[in-house]
Amino acid sequence: MRDRYRNGLAVVDASLDVFRARPGLAILPLLSLIAVGSAYAAVGVAILHYGLLGAVFTNDLVRYGAMFAGLAISSSVGVFFNAAVVHCASRQFDGKETSARDGLAAAWDARREIAKWSLVSATIGTLLYVAEDNAPGVGTLTRSILNLGWGLLTFFVVPVIVTDRTGSLRSELRKSGDAFARTWGESITAAFGIGLALFPVTLAGICMLVVAYVSATGLTAYGLGALGGLLVVATLVVTQVLGMIVRTALYRYATDGECVGPLAELDPEEVFVDD
């Protein structure tokens, strides 16, 4: 197990080299953040316009409906732009030219699969919140466990959608689950390793925002706030790109046995450990 975790960190380090070779991929998660923020703002304006703000807190139907809408928006937009990153990363692994426009076109071609997954994810997420609200304590624990299980089962769903295009939710789930079972240690460590590697930058950005809000004034406050916000957004963007690069490479190895991208310079006998 220790070997799996160490090897996962090696994959993260190698993925940084891939990102440096194609820094333009950062525009995709940045567009995702803008799109999600704009969609949430539109929903918020609609809620205020129709006087539904009070009902969101008092009416279960309205509250869960708003929750479903929020989850569907974040899931659909997130998967769409992640699919674009996966397409670009996969083409780069194959030595082909690619661009953000190519990735967006590929994601658009897979829009039906993305829409289906978004609705499924939003439905499951909403049902878990309903269970939590109706069974305090037990519901919270159950939601946490099921959320974790769902996250692991669907870890490779985006690469499956982009590369396999089966059109079947069951088949996509099975493929994602099988790939995760073959690379679980490396996958988990890579996911956490990316966050840990960028945590100091994120923390610095958050501290700047706090100082700007609490104690700074004038131009100093605006400067710290802008720099802190920029650091936080930058880490979110880089985290998303690296995560998709790693998942794409690990999925290719799990399904085809190919060592591509961040795995290409590593010895597979050292990176992948049989239990």
Regions found by a protein language model. Give the residues of each.
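Hydrophobic alpha-helical membrane segments
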Residues: M1-D275
